[in-house]
Structures are given as C-alpha cells and as structure tokens.
Amino acid sequence: MIVILNNGGQYVHRIHRSLRYLKIPSKIIPNSTPLAEIEENKEIKGIILSGGPDIEKASNCLDIALNSKLPILGICLGHQIIAKAYGGEIGRAESEEYAHSKIFVKEENDLFKNVPKEFTAWASHKDEVVGAPLNFEILAYSNICEVEAMKHKEKPIYGVQFHPEVSHTENGAEILKNFCKVCGLLGE
C-alpha cells in the first residue's frame, strides 16, 4: 500500500485514483499523521507527499521527508517540502505555471524508466524548487523550471514539480508505476 499525505492540493484524489488504475492499494491520510504511525503499519511500502497551497501547513511532512525509511515521492508542494527538508531553496516561480510544460529528462533513471526524454506535463504552481539540495541530483528540467524532478543520491526519495497524476501529463501513469516499482509493489 502507498499512503498519500494530503497537503490540501486539488489533485490529491487523482493520485489515489491513478494508483487504483494501476491496481495499487492506496489511502489518503492527513498530513499531520506521525511518521511512527505510518512506519508501524507493515502494509505501507511507500509515501506520496501531495501538492497543496501552503508549505507552512505541511511541517510534519518535513520530518517525514528527512526521517522515513520508506520510499517517498513528492508531487508539486511535496517536491518543495523534500527540497526544504534537505536544505534546498524554494522561491517564487519566474513564470507561474498553470498549463502544459515541456519536460526534459536528463537521463533514464528509476523514476523515468521507459519515459521519453521529452514529454508534456501539467504544471500548477506559484512556487518551485530554485536550488536542489546538495545531496540530490536533478533528473529533469523545463525551459521555465530548472528542477522539475530530483532524486536523493542515496535514499529512494524523489520529487517532481509537475503533476504525473493528471491526465494532461504524458506518461504520468508510467512515472507513478515506476515509483511503485521502487516501493516493491510492481515487478519489472
């Protein structure tokens, strides 16, 4: 099972639905749920930090990003939470995105396996990661956002600024499927 921490974003239920289409059990839980409570449930194999309007209302997710032993995928605000937790820089987007964005994958990796080097994704944010943390590598970028996706160099922690759960994102289901594989929920 994947738990989706609800940070109040408009697409949280789409994440749940997208996982259901992949036949992956998931559950939406409050973003205030303690990490110990999540990790004591042995059915939980991964965590998704959803998007949302306010990083200040997601402070518990900072602890989860830093201390979880489970794989994590941060989406939009969740991506920013991961960056902030590890010392990255969040700032106002140069161009507020509420539209399609062309994403460029730097090289194939666990998250972007079987995903083209260029694809169109749906973006919906005012803020973004403007400086990746030192212990993260940038996986993808766009012409208006230098850190569209990143990964911790040693832990299975990923962040994407765009929304793979939205149907407007090409290969979004494949990206979510790849995260599920990282969690050990799908075979190769």
UniProtKB/Swiss-Prot annotation:
Task: Respond yes or no to whether keyword ATP-binding is given for this record.
Answer: yes
GO cellular component terms, semicolon-separated? cytosol
What InterPro entries would the database entry show? Class_I_gatase-like (IPR029062), GATASE (IPR017926), GMP_synth_GATase (IPR004739), GMP_synthase_A (IPR023686)
Q: What superkingdom heads the lineage?
A: Archaea
Q: Which residues form the Glutamine amidotransferase type-1 domain?
A: 1-188
GO molecular-function term, one example from the UniProt record: GMP synthase activity
**Which keywords does this chain's UniProt record carry?**
ATP-binding, Glutamine amidotransferase, GMP biosynthesis, Ligase, Nucleotide-binding, Purine biosynthesis
Active site positions, chain numbering: 76 (nucleophile), 163, 165
Give EC number(s), comma-separated: 6.3.5.2
Does Nucleotide-binding appear among the keywords? yes
Query: Which pathway does the protein contribute to?
Result: Purine metabolism; GMP biosynthesis; GMP from XMP (L-Gln route): step 1/1
Quaternary structure?
Heterodimer composed of a glutamine amidotransferase subunit (A) and a GMP-binding subunit (B).
Its recorded name reads GMP synthase [glutamine-hydrolyzing] subunit A
